[in-house]
Each structure stands twice: as C-alpha cells, then as structure tokens.
Regions:
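Hinge/lid segment of periplasmic solute-binding proteins
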Residues: 105-162, 204-211, 308-310, 374-379, ...
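A structural signal for short loop-to-beta-strand junctions that line the ligand-binding cleft
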Residues: 90-91, 98-99, 130-169, 208, ...
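C-terminal lobe and pocket-closing loops
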Residues: 125, 296-304, 316-410, 441
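Extracytoplasmic/periplasmic solute-binding protein
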Residues: 147-156, 161, 185-245
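Extracytoplasmic "Venus flytrap"/periplasmic binding protein-like
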Residues: 65-137, 146, 171-174, 280-282, ...
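Short, low-complexity disordered leader/linker segments with a strong preference
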Residues: 1-45, 68, 376, 434-442
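Glycine-centered hinge/linker elements that transmit conformational signals in sensory
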Residues: 190-191, 241-273, 303, 312
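Conserved C-terminal helix/tail region of periplasmic/extracytoplasmic solute-binding proteins
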Residues: 171, 264, 386-442
Length: 442
C-alpha cells in the first residue's frame, strides 16, 4: 500500500513538472514572438505637405511604394494647402510637429535659423545614397537650405520659368517661333504682332484700336517676377554680400522701366481683365499668345492647341537669366526617430525627383533620362534643361519676408496696379529695403 502511494505521488509530481515545463516553454515562445514582432514593427513617420487633392493622390502612390519596400518606416501624409505656412510654423514651434515637412526656399532660411530643422550635414556626408550627394545638386537649389555652413534640408524641385507659346496663334499671324536670338526687342516685336483688336489689326499697325483688344501678345500681373528682367539686364535687387538693395543701379532701373512699360502697354491685358478672366486661364482660352510660367506648370499638356515651350528671351546685352523656383523638404529637429526619419527623408526626396519637373540634380539633367520619366513632355524638356544652367533664385535670408513685403507693397504693387513711375518710387523704397538688410546683419 505504501509503495502504491509513493508511486502515485511520483506520477503526480512528474505530471506537474511536465505541465510546468510546457507552460514555461509556451511563455518563452510567446515572449520571443513578441520581441520579434517589436523588432520588425515599422516606425510611423508623419509627413506634412501643402499638396492639393490631385497632387496628394499622386504622392500617396509614391508613399505606398516606398512603404512596401521599407522594413523601417511607414510614411503617413497629412496634406492640406490651407494656411500651410502658418500651420507648420505653429506645429514646429511646439511639440506636435510632423517628422518630415515640405518647405519653401523662403521659409527654409527662417526655420534653419530658429533651430526647428534638423542639421543633416553629417548624415548626408555619411550616406552612400546618390540622393545624398550634395555635389550633384545645382547650387541655386541647395543654397536656400544652407545656414552657417550647415545643411538643413534638400530641394525636391527647381522649376525654371520658361516661355509657353500658342503655336496656332503664331502661325495665324505669321510670327516666327522663338529661337536663341530672341532678346527683349524681338520679344516685344512678336508681342505687338500677336496683339489683335476687334478689326483684326495688330499693335504695330497705325490704325490699331487699343481700346478694343481681343487677343493679347503677353500677360503679367506681378508674375513673372521683375527680378528676372533685372538679372537679364545685369542688375540685382539684393547685393551678393547682403549689404544693400541696388535697385537704383542703371541696369535695375532700366529693367523696372521695361516691366512698367509692358504693364501699361496694349500688349498686356489690364489688371482688371486678368482678375476677371483668370491669369493662366486667358492663355488656356487662347486670349493670350505668350505666357511665362514654371516648368512644372505643364501648360503644354493642359491645352487644346499646339503649345510650345521655349527658353526666355535674353536681355539687351545677351545675358540669359530665369528664376528657378525651389521647393524642398526638412526634418523636424524634435523628431523622436531621427535616424529612421532621415532614411525616409532620403528615399522620399529621391522618389519626388523622379516625379517632378525639374529635379534639382545635375546627373538627372539629361534629355534621355527625362524623356523616360516624362514622355508626355518630350518636346518641352530640352528648353527646361537648358534653362537650369542659368536659373537663379532669390537671395533669401532670415528676414527676407520683411524685405519682400516692402518690395511688393511699396514698389511692385504701385507699378502694376497704379501705373506708378519706377523712377519716382525707387529712391523712396531703397532706404527701407537697405534698413531691413542692415538689421539682419546685426
């Protein structure tokens, strides 16, 4: 009896040990599985952009592809163009900002100076990804993201301003298409011949009726910016050393006069007509024959007539210059996942370079590559690529918005909307602009 009891107790003990071992093994396996899941769990990277509905949809397709290829991150976009600058500035000042965000060249200088953008200088130097090679970027596109010898972001587009023309209207009036010899004089001559009144007379005819124009040769409303014409004439609006605004130089004054004369000429619609009918809409509706717009505007793909894309006419002495409109992306200095955010930043920047016209990298500025990426714009790409070689950007600095506010409201608005004489305004406005620059230098 005693032996049977001992045997029973031994069996119970053995079963208990086996059950305990299984439970421990299950617990260990479960723990290992959880640890593996945590190791492979992606980091959520929040991205803020100003993209509208259509652009956000295209962007999402890019993000879906990147997210599927990455084991590290999952980029989630928050795209809303409404009050973007105000919203992102507020978010970055607090603790609710995104990990990545789109930023204009103008804002980049401000954000970098306020330490809200992550300094990525060393990270770029240590990366072997082609997109991180800063020597491949056009200097005009990279310079807005530099502050005190450090880099705080990368551009994902530099779209030069180009000349869109309605070839059908050129053909109808017998005007030759633009070529490399086009300067201000040839541009004006074409604009006159392309400006038609209700009687079919053009602006170069003595009997032309400027009060009853039905077709205009050109249009402007503050765009294209006057800086383009100042540069083409050998002038500038901010000196290279940021010490002053040389808008009173002979070269600059002549360019302001050229711009004002265009605004007041019959070749350009009145500002009221432009407001009523729509700026680029008038070009699309064949009421304007020539339009200066960004390369990414893609007007050549959005109209029902033969549309050509050309380089801008050069200045009187042959100087070629255009504006390179630069947009880019930065990393929030307060991101909790800087390493992963940087990798997502690089991958997304590279992907946008494949998407947008024109990528700001010299290695991508060749016609064969661009035709593969954008076959629908094959005829426009050479002029765009050529324009990149001499595209310039504004000289941004920390207080640039203050400078630009005075330049716009005190100088350009009166010229455009009130027919003011630039020679009268310039002596009054220059001291105000110089004061902003001197304040920034302190």
């Amino acid at each position: 009896m005693k032996k049977r009891l001992e045997l029973l107790l031994s069996l119970i003990l053995l079963i208990s040990i086996m059950i305990s071992g299984c439970a421990t093994q299950d617990k260990t396996s479960s723990s290992q599985k959880n640890e593996a899941d945590e190791a492979t769990q992606k980091v959520t990277i929040r991205l803020s952009t100003w993209a509208g509905a259509d652009e956000a949809k295209e962007l999402q397709a890019i993000l879906d592809k990147l997210n599927s290829q990455s084991n590290e991150y999952e980029i989630v976009q928050d795209s809303n163009p409404a009050d973007y600058d105000t919203r992102i500035t507020t978010q970055l000042a607090g603790s609710s900002g995104p990990d990545l965000f789109w930023v204009s060249a103008q804002r980049a200088a401000q954000f970098a100076s306020k330490n809200v953008m992550l300094d990525i200088t060393q990270r770029l130097a240590q990366s072997n990804k082609p997109v991180a090679n800063i020597s491949d970027y056009y200097e005009t596109s990279l310079s807005p993201f530099k502050y005190k010898d450090s880099i705080y972001g990368l551009p994902w587009i530099e779209q030069p301003v180009v000349l869109y023309i309605n070839k059908d209207l050129f053909d109808k009036t017998g005007v030759s298409y633009p070529d490399s010899s086009w300067n201000w004089d040839k541009f004006l001559d074409a604009a006159k011949k392309l400006t038609i009144d209700k009687n079919g007379k053009n602006a170069s005819d003595a009997s032309f009726d400027k009060e009853n124009v039905t077709q205009w040769g050109f249009t402007l409303n503050g765009w294209p910016p006057v800086q383009i014409f100042v540069w083409q004439n050998g002038g500038d609006v901010i000196s290279e050393d940021f010490s002053n605004s040389p808008i009173d130089s002979p070269e600059a004054e002549a360019a302001f006069k050229f711009y004002a004369d265009l605004v007041n000429s019959p070749m350009v619609p009145s500002q009221q007509i432009i407001k009523d009918r729509g700026f680029d809409t008038m070009f699309k509706n064949q009421q304007v024959a020539m339009f200066m717009g960004g390369a990414a505007d893609s007007l050549d793909t959005k109209v029902d007539f033969k549309c050509g894309v050309y380089e801008l006419p050069c200045g009187p002495t042959g100087i070629k210059a255009t504006l390179g409109d630069v947009l880019g992306m930065g990393i929030n200095a307060k991101t909790k996942n800087a390493d992963v955010a940087f990798e997502a930043f690089l991958d997304l920047t590279d992907a946008i370079h494949q998407w947008k016209v024109m990528p700001p990298r010299k290695s991508m500025a060749n016609i064969d590559m661009m035709k593969k990426l954008h076959p629908d714009r094959a005829d426009a790409l050479q002029a765009i690529i050529n324009s990149m070689e001499y595209a310039r950007t504004y000289r941004y600095f920390e207080n640039y918005p203050d400078w630009d506010n005075i330049f716009s409201t005190q100088l350009m608005d009166p010229i455009i909307n009130s027919h003011a004489d630039p020679s009268v305004l310039i002596p009054k406005v220059k001291p105000q602009l110089d004061a902003i620059l001197k304040k920034a230098a302190k």
